[in-house]
Amino acid sequence: MKKKIGGILLDGRTMKKFFTVLFVSFIFMSGAFAQVSVDPDDTFYSLVESWELRGLINEVPPLRPYPIANIRDILQTVIEKGNDRDVRNAKMYWEKVTGKPWNVSAEVGAMYRKNAETSDFGEILFSLFPSVNGDITLFDSFVSMGYDLGLASYNHDIQDYLAVFENDGHDARRNKVALGDLNVFLEMNDVLAIGKKNIFVQTGIYRSGYGPFINAGLSLNDNSYHRTNLSFTTVNPKWSYTQQYSAIGATKSFDGGFIAPDKYLAFHALEFKFIPQFSFSYYESIVFGKRLDPSYLMPVPYIVAQEIGGYNDNLQMGLAFKVRPYSGLLWATDVFVDDFNIAGFFENGLLNTRFFTAVKTGLIYTPADSFCTRISLDYTMLMPYTYTHADYVDTTTGTISSGMYNYLNYTNNGIPMGSSYPPNSDRLSFELDFIPIPPLHIKVLSTFLRHGNINESISDDEAIAYLRSDYGTYSTDGGINNHPLMSNPSGTAGTAIASSNSLNFLTQDNLMYVLQEGIGAEYSLKKYSWGQLSFSVSYLFEWIRNKGVDTDMFPGKGSAIIDKGNGTYEYDHEDYSGSDLVSLFRNAWKAGLSNEINNYFSIGLKYQF
């Protein structure tokens, strides 16, 4: 006998397996109510932003999430110094972090994506996130552990229901268990913290975020995939320092598929707070693999430590500053430098030099006592090839081959660790947060993004080199896997294509344009002895012009393209000049572009006991 549950057809044996997993997940397992000490995306950190901008608190750790000792100290300060609205929010979180050390939670959700040109209703994505989560503290919070242990379950691929360039909010990506049409993923995060509020160590498996732009950082993005982290932080009135060493996942260099171990990220940042209205930060990150390197655990400049290993790792540097000209108002800027040819800049100018850089600047305003709790306006630009990096078969050769893993690009499990937008993009974003009544939280957003495939700007010779390579060697989709280096077996590093020495920022003929307008709301009922219920609903309108820009333009054809000499090539039993062959593939890529309008709907019910 077979029975349908939420549109999923299950036979008797599978039903028994389904309910067994469901029962176990309620007892032991994460997803719905992530803990403040585990999840850097929790609303708590937006509240901290407001409290800091208005001068209620002065010293917060540079890395999110915070240890329980810091969270409690922040909440106590706000309860003592804040207005009625601040106190109400702080007390709500105080109950969470000082309550019982475990909570059983579950979230049931439904998502629907509707293409405006499609007449049928389409299929609904049903999701279930059962969990156990909580905080454990010892020795007056000198030792604390936050945990969020559970399952993420879907009846369809979640990637098909996300807006363009959006990261999934859950760490459920691989090693699924199929129960009929239901895909179940293990999802666990935990953070162990040891120390006092001004100096501490954290370790565990969790997402981490850095910088003034929550969920949109250029170096460590709060909504990127989780990592195994070990960090040290010290927070002082005039300066702070943090250092994090992370184990991450390497994926195929061509498309970010599959996964392999032995890839690492090291990050550290030093912030100076000269006056209450101004702070300045310098940070470095470095990606490396196939070895453990203790030199990146030391508080020394990575640009110096890298020299010991021969400059084979992927180093980035950044500068950030925050200006608070008025209570509740912040102007923040973050400059992330991946690769910048300084000599070329002075010799040839900015338009004719290698400049792999990301910049984000914006204004954030958090009124003191208003139902509008946050207003933000920011602009982001990512130059071509930012975050990309080639890897080689081994450290003795510049050979790049089909199917190899990349241990050097700025991804974890194939997901960008910085901005979620691809290189050669810019984005303007406006957001509003409202709390008209305390249990109701409303968020409104409006964004406009442009993206170009850098391969529209390369030369015919460079395009032919891509086409004549083996399939799976080079990506030409203009994304984070599309680096500018070609294989160089006779050297120790690849050869950069000449076009990468020109800026070419959004100068392509066929740009992708994305407009998004959205609204979401969440309402929580009063907490009772039997638990608490929360409801959420959201809608997003998305307009895309030239969808498909981010697809391969010059896929490798290997021996299918024959060089007949004199600038003539044979492909598919036809002869072409070099320029005609390039035009053939470029025109095929252009023919695949389309305009699209999408509507995204989601509803959710959360329960916590």
Label the model's feature ranges.
Residues 39-42, 54-62, 66-279, 290, ...:
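Outer-membrane beta-barrel channel domains
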Residues 32-34:
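Boundary at the C-terminal end of the N-terminal hydrophobic targeting segment
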